């Protein structure tokens, strides 16, 4: 019974994160870098078919499509240890190789030109699935390819596969510091419109929080992108464990989304993970004690969140799903939930159930860890709106000066007017208002 997920990796960030993700999945499922099964790995304990298919020579191949408008990152992946893992027919690098120049409009326009090639790959993967559940897009929203090509993909996937789930792992820029991409607020706003209108669930990760976690939890002061990507791939693999080691609940994407997203517009999720160790991130320090209560309490601590938000007085959780991996006794889980409720460690919306949902999941038998229990929290929290507000404020400052708009006017979508900017701004402003409305007791009757 397959519920397959096709992964689309767009741009530099998407492909670098994706590359780490596939390495992590191979380790967890006992798959060698060339796709063959390790001698010690056994069939039947896990569901590899959600993310991999088997070729005629029984090698495991990721259901992944690698897309970029410049060749450097994809070439690095293909010349690396895991380079022969991927299906070469599922790799698209633009022939002119010039990239999108950190410009959303260029990435979007380029995607239109090459879409026939990309859609062939997507259709072939979809037809090779027994019962495709949906798509997962990995990208960043600040540059040109991940944002522009990513946006175009989201729109077309909705048109072409209206009944399939579209979920993303979207890396937001560190918008509290000066960026080397001056047009980042434009790119972010235009992408946010598509993430709001064309995705069913968006897992938000931001570079500011990732750098902070690396410094604070792992004692790595200036983390490399490679180390930050290891954090992201750990979260991605943990968020898919219930699909790959299925239990009674949360064993497909639709059930995870249904438990986290009660109203369709508020579908931006944040994550926390504990404990990070040197097994996931090179040179990280370890935490000694991991009881179920300890893990569940740490997951609720703001400093472990992978999104840098500014919670207001009324900020609250809409929903929480904790995925606990390892040796977890259901009685311990029950006691931990009672303790968290007694101590009021989590504030929920006034109009819905104030409960933390918990999924217990197996750990990979092939990876030895020095902690008994690890946990991932997927949370829908109203403070995520503060991240969108920052993007909006930065956009407004640039737009007021009409800065750098000529680069966008060169592309057909902005040739005759800048309406697309105004329209995107309105969609994001509505999204912020929706999250603020969620904090009110009368939300459902508004």
UniProtKB/Swiss-Prot annotation:
Residues that hold GTP according to the record: 142-148
Pfam families according to UniProt: Tubulin, Tubulin_C
A GO molecular function held by the record: GTP binding
Gene Ontology cellular component annotations, sorted alphabetically: cytoplasm; equatorial microtubule organizing center; gamma-tubulin ring complex; gamma-tubulin small complex; half bridge of mitotic spindle pole body; inner plaque of mitotic spindle pole body; interphase microtubule organizing center; mating projection tip
UniProt entry keywords in alphabetical sequence: Cytoplasm, Cytoskeleton, GTP-binding, Microtubule, Nucleotide-binding
Domain of life: Eukaryota
Database matches in SUPFAM superfamilies: Tubulin C-terminal domain-like, Tubulin nucleotide-binding domain-like
GO biological process, one term: microtubule nucleation
Cellular compartment(s): Cytoplasm, Cytoskeleton, Microtubule organizing center, Spindle pole body
Family under the similarity heading: Belongs to the tubulin family.
Function: Tubulin is the major constituent of microtubules. The gamma chain is found at microtubule organizing centers (MTOC) such as the spindle poles or the centrosome, suggesting that it is involved in the minus-end nucleation of microtubule assembly.
Protein name, UniProt field: Tubulin gamma chain
Native source species: Schizosaccharomyces japonicus (Fission yeast)
Gene: tug1
